[in-house]
Amino acid sequence: MPTLKNFHNKQSTTNQLPHNMNKDLLSFYHRRVAHYAALAERLRKRNKLFMLSSFLSFMLIPACIGFYASADKGQLWLMAGLLAFLLYLAIRYLDNKNGKQIEHAENLLSVYEKEEAYQQNNFSRFGSGEQYIDPRHAFTYDLDIFGSGSLFQRMNRTITTGGSDTLAGYLADVRMRPVGEIEKRREAIRELAECEPLRAAFCAHGQKHIINTAEILSALNTIKDIRISKFALSRLSLGMAGLGIGLLAVTTVLAATGNLSPVIPVAWAVIQLFAVQTACARSLGKINKVVGKMHTHLRAYISLIRLIAASDLKAAENREIITAIAGKETDAIASFEQLSRLLDGLDQRSNIMGLILFNSLFASDYFLVRRFLKWQVRYMPCIEDWIAAVSRFDALVSLATYRYNEPQAVDAEIVDEEQVVYRAEGIYHPFLGEKAVSNNFCIDDRHYYIITGANMAGKSTFLRTIGVNYLLAVNGLPVFADRLTVSVFSLFTGMRTTDDLNHGISYFNAELLRLKQLMESCRRSPRTLIILDEILKGTNSLDKLNGSRLFLQEIATLAATGIIATHDLELSKMADAMPDRFHNHCFEIQLSTDITYTYKITPGVARNQNATYLLRKMLLTH
């Protein structure tokens, strides 16, 4: 099995960054797919054998009974029938066990098929996070964090909706958290990345369906509000129930021995049935209405909690999660198992004959209500914390899998400084793979970098490279660079403005609103890196240039730092007016018979543009 350590021994330092190391991962996942496909097929063949054996052993039972009834000395046939019955039970047990093994093998097969597809740049089998797209967010919309082909989709292995929400929250929030917190997250991710079998087993539980955390929490919160008389918890009620069951047993024995009329135990059983039904049926109906559909989800949660609790993880954040669900003061496993058994009891109430029998003889509904109340009092206050802990672990599994799948990435150095620090060597965009061209770039606090260049020269991709790698770094993930040193700061982008015709907002008005939002954000959080692609898109060139100058002059009065890509070469003269704050960089192209794109950033102002050249070439071809 490949490990992170083996992969990180080799780092590409060339401008062209091949991902040939990922061929090892592709080979590993391919072998896992082949293994579990073969295993599932073997188990399915065994299942057919069990079905045949089960049928034959079952048919032996009536045959043996028939021979026993017709034979003079049929004791041997009776024994044979008993053995056939025991054989049938054993085969059914093995068949049930084999069925679970088939399901587990198929789930793991699905896990590894998805990872194999990931290595082949097919991310369609992972949730895209479209529900989290927000054009007004400070940076996620511009940096392609959510949606088809997004960073979230590449990372997302979550199997609970709570885990998905937690992962989305991590990627959408880069508030100035302590460096120690980032290091703690990194250690947890690194440890989980090295536990590939644990991650695969965890993900296997969500291959058939996603566990809806919101539905479970909603149901459990409703349970919390269900008002049931606490009398069922009292010793008096327990004594009364015990007395009723005991009297029924005594009167039944007396009636069976001829010492009492049979009418008395029957009448007592009927009275007990109506008493229990009157006292408990309404309460159990409320409970069943709320949680009756949760059984499948709860069983899955029990499996996840068992898996987490049994893991031997040492990293601080991982230990926090384990302690939260299986510490001395809490017992999530016992809680969910008790709730699952309660749901089993509720399911069994659908059998009317059984309900009448067990309530008449054993007051079963009373004990079901009593068990529920005890569970509600003991465990209900902890449920939300346990589910939140599982959601955190679910999100960490996704982050760790991303780290494992991208062995060419390296850990960033996070420095604890009260200013914007961003020093990158050989940085490139994580989506580009072997097509990526790396660049060196350094951002100083409260400085502004104006980047010029022709269309398609690489400006926008470079801006996203800066933003996405920072986002990875502060989430404790490795970055796509030879080396990256960053401090912790806020991030705000303006790259992909959209109009909103439903609210009467034009494209240009949307651009102004975005810049206003940016200014307000910088005033709230002075240590901010702003990334802008073409200020004031949607107006004429001269107005755009003057407006851009005015905006940059105003933003320069704030304690912010920025990178601004533009086609307006005149805007580069800001560096002449304020050389201590503004700096020019460019992506140059070479024009000859064809255009050569280097995708390398260099100091200075771009000299060559390509719009007219490309248009003329297009017209000539027609």
Label each region the model flagged.
Residues L399-Y402, E406-H622:
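ATPase nucleotide-binding head domains, primarily ABC-like/P-loop NTPase cores
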Residues H8-Q11, Q16-H19:
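Low-complexity, intrinsically disordered or signal/transmembrane-proximal segments
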Residues N20-A454, F462-L491, L513-R514:
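Alpha-helical coupling/stalk and coiled-coil linker elements that connect catalytic or binding modules
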